[in-house]
């Protein structure tokens, strides 16, 4: 039986939705010099490299969220010619094979693909025995998420949930963390097959937005809402490799799912590795191997 670690027990007691609502309002406030002071402190505290931003001037950002979702100079993130490229800056939390329907979270903790995908077993079956990668975006990272490959948007599902932190300690301590936190599930169809990008919320993550929809989970009220789904069968929503697909307004985690025999990860990819948007992530799997 998977049990929670005592080290994360206080998170069960915190009013996480209320704290996140408050943080979102602060992050969107135009507070002049106070906003600049907050951004300056954040840059110092987390070692943010502003030289990579299109706009490195801290004083010019009207809100903290405007700073947090700042675009990068794209010449700093060249797009690999590999079949699949890394969709975000961050650290690899875990990656590997989906064992039946089970995805590895941390030692002693697995969760099911169906649970991650909002209980949709039929959708989850596409990924049984496939591959997954979990990418953690720390506070210092660039927080836009990009396309790993050319693909058409097929479905999007919003699943309300909890808002535990997604740092390493919490990942080790909270069973089924990514399948219980609030998340936005994006399903794509590429020339190689379907895949899922799951944008997982966390404590004080202001909201999640996609380029085709805008903000999916606006922080205008406390607490969870119902599951919502959008289908794009009749729409021609095609995004190219390297295009922005979404962003976090305060950071979190991306979980990627691929069917069996679809991809072969870059051999250099391993848990704990620092990664950058645009680098080689994977190639199309060789069926003969």
Curated annotation (Swiss-Prot):
Membrane topology designation: Peripheral membrane protein
Principal cellular location given in the protein's record: membrane
Active site: 89, 146, 252
EC annotation from Swiss-Prot or TrEMBL: 4.1.1.65
Subcellular localization, as worded in the UniProt entry: Cell membrane
Post-translational modification (record): Is synthesized initially as an inactive proenzyme. Formation of the active enzyme involves a self-maturation process in which the active site pyruvoyl group is generated from an internal serine residue via an autocatalytic post-translational modification. Two non-identical subunits are generated from the proenzyme in this reaction, and the pyruvate is formed at the N-terminus of the alpha chain, which is derived from the carboxyl end of the proenzyme.
Cofactor: pyruvate
Domain of life: Bacteria
One Pfam match: PS_Dcarbxylase
InterPro entries hit by this protein: PS_Dcarbxylase (IPR003817), PSD-B (IPR033177), PSD_type1_pro (IPR033178)
Cofactor: how bound: Binds 1 pyruvoyl group covalently per subunit.
Cellular component aspect of the GO annotation: plasma membrane
Molecular function GO labels: phosphatidylserine decarboxylase activity
Pathway(s) the chain acts in: Phospholipid metabolism; phosphatidylethanolamine biosynthesis; phosphatidylethanolamine from CDP-diacylglycerol: step 2/2
Residue numbers carrying Pyruvic acid (Ser): 252
Catalyzed chemical reaction(s): a 1,2-diacyl-sn-glycero-3-phospho-L-serine + H(+) = a 1,2-diacyl-sn-glycero-3-phosphoethanolamine + CO2
UniProt KW keywords: Cell membrane, Decarboxylase, Lipid biosynthesis, Lipid metabolism, Lyase, Membrane, Phospholipid biosynthesis, Phospholipid metabolism, Pyruvate, Zymogen
Subunit: Heterodimer of a large membrane-associated beta subunit and a small pyruvoyl-containing alpha subunit.
Entry-linked NCBIfam families: PS_decarb
Family: Belongs to the phosphatidylserine decarboxylase family. PSD-B subfamily. Prokaryotic type I sub-subfamily.
PANTHER family to which the protein is assigned, alphabetical: PHOSPHATIDYLSERINE DECARBOXYLASE (PTHR10067), PHOSPHATIDYLSERINE DECARBOXYLASE PROENZYME, MITOCHONDRIAL (PTHR10067:SF6)
Protein name according to UniProt: Phosphatidylserine decarboxylase proenzyme
Species this protein is from: Nitrosospira multiformis (strain ATCC 25196 / NCIMB 11849 / C 71)
Gene expressing this chain: psd
């Amino acid at each position: 039986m998977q049990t929670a670690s005592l080290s994360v027990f206080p998170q069960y007691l915190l009013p996480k939705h209320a704290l996140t609502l408050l943080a979102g309002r602060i992050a969107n406030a135009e507070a002049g010099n106070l906003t600049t002071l907050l951004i300056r402190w954040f840059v110092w505290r987390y070692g943010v490299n502003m030289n990579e931003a299109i706009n490195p001037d801290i004083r010019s950002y009207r809100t903290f969220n405007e700073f947090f979702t700042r675009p990068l100079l794209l010449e700093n993130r060249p797009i690999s010619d590999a079949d699949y490229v890394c969709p975000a800056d961050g650290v690899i939390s875990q990656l590997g094979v989906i064992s039946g329907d089970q995805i590895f979270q941390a030692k002693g903790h697995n969760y099911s693909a169906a649970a991650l995908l909002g209980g949709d077993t039929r959708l989850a079956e596409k990924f049984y025995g496939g591959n997954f990668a979990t990418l953690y975006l720390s506070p210092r990272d660039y927080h836009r998420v990009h396309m790993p490959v050319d693909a058409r948007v097929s479905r999007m599902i919003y699943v309300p949930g909890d808002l535990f932190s997604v740092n390493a300690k919490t990942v080790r301590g909270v069973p089924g963390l990514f399948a219980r936190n609030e998340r936005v599930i994006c399903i794509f169809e590429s020339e190689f097959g379907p895949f899922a990008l799951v944008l997982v919320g966390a404590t004080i993550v202001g909201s999640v937005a996609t380029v085709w929809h805008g903000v999916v989970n606006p922080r205008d009220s406390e607490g969870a809402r119902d599951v919502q789904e959008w289908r794009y069968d009749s729409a021609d929503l095609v995004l190219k490799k390297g295009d922005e697909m979404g962003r976090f307004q305060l950071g979190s985690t991306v979980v990627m799912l691929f069917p069996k025999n679809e991809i072969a990860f870059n051999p250099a990819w391993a848990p704990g590795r620092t990664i950058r948007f645009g680098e080689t992530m994977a190639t199309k799997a060789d069926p003969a191997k």
